[in-house]
UniProtKB/Swiss-Prot annotation:
One of its GO terms (molecular function) is structural constituent of ribosome. GO terms for cellular component: cytosolic small ribosomal subunit. This is Small ribosomal subunit protein uS2. It holds the Pfam family Ribosomal_S2. It comes from the Bacteria. Keywords: Ribonucleoprotein, Ribosomal protein. The gene is rpsB. Belongs to the universal ribosomal protein uS2 family.
Amino acid sequence: MAAISMKQLLEAGVHFGHQTRRWNPKMKKYIFTERNGIYIIDLQKTVKKVDEAYNYVKEIASNGGTILFVGTKKQAQDSVRDEAIRSGMYFVNQRWLGGTLTNFQTIRKRINRLKSIEKMEEDGTFEVLPKKEVVNLLKEKERLVKFLGGIKEMNKLPDALFVIDPRKERIAIAEAHKLNIPIIGIVDTNCDPDEIDYVIPANDDAIRAVKLLTSKMADAILEVKQGEETEVVEEEANEAVAEEEAAEEVSTQE
């Protein structure tokens, strides 16, 4: 069964592309038709591409890998944060800081600074510091949380990026390319699909469309995680049954 239905895509407005004058000819193969000066995306191809991306995300999750969700445009910020948190992954939904991937060790230093301020706040250090210093530290913390909060626990480079709007996130994409990190992306009719390893041709401007597709990637991760949890429970149950049977056998022999 497909990971997503044509009905879901239509209801979310995934098929609406950009104006015909703002297009990338490389997206031609994903365009169904043109209507009132707007390109209509071929949703049959979107269904197929969502399936490919879904299976790839499941593969990463099965191997214990991590995915960094990236979407800094207004329409994507909430979905990127919510779905990354729901699936236990990482996210960047404010400005992409140059070097987030290519200069990861420096970024880690900023994250350690954030953790250090949070520790000071928790262990009572703030209570003995001058009020002005505390105010400055809280401002610094707020700024660090805004830009780095979503990757605070990311201790190594991600195994893949999930990106909304490659044009908007071109710095993130360039960094991923440099490090050979695969990219899954929601790609509208004005983008270059060649930059993306797993293209999802779709409207990247409608909040509902972005939410639907982002939630599907999170679902793929959770499908794997919940499957693993079920396996652990079954293993524990089987072990308990085996122990009971062994105990019964011993008591029978006695």
